[in-house]
């Protein structure tokens, strides 16, 4: 009898680090989660249930913000402004916030995942305030040590090819 092959185990995600659609780093980071890298998975908790980080992303563009306390009103306003990004081909583009924290936080209207083992923060070289812009295919587009909606909007425009000459 023929053996079945799990083809999913034979594939390796591509690093798209050379793509002009990525936004180069302006802040210092360590590790593999560079713009263009496929996201690393890690165990998390969502609504008190064990889960995996990658199951929480991939529903569109997302901004993953690391926080140890509820975000300030300014940061919440920046996250809200990201929900209504400039349209692409006359279609609205939303950026969905995802908050990663080491302890439970209640932030109305936003998904909060608890990094119970600290592995998400470690793998993403994150500290409170670090933010990542993620593609729908679970690749890193850009990352910063602090969230800035203007930088995030510029990175999204670049990812959508809405800027002049990409270099």
Segments (PLM) and residue ranges:
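Helical substrate-recognition/capping region of FAD-dependent monooxygenase/halogenase enzymes
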Residues: 1-167
